[in-house]
From Swiss-Prot:
Chief place of localization: host cell
Transmembrane domains' residue ranges: 18-38
The keyword Transmembrane appears for this protein: yes
Keywords: Host membrane, Membrane, Transmembrane, Transmembrane helix
Compartment list: Host membrane
Protein name: Uncharacterized protein ORF48a
Length: 48
């Protein structure tokens, strides 16, 4: 596992935590976090 993949994993976990804890406070943060997660997922699929 490369350093970039480890960083992506950490970012993904962090964003999921944000979505779970703060979705009811501010919807724009949640939408932004979902967008980043989606982009990470696309990046991984293109790499494989």
């Amino acid at each position: 596992m490369s350093l970039k993949e480890k960083i992506l994993d950490k970012v993904e976990d962090f964003l999921k935590t944000i979505i779970i804890k703060y979705w009811y406070i501010d919807l724009t943060i949640t939408i932004f976090a979902f967008l980043i997660l989606y982009l990470i997922e696309k990046f991984r699929k293109n790499k494989v």
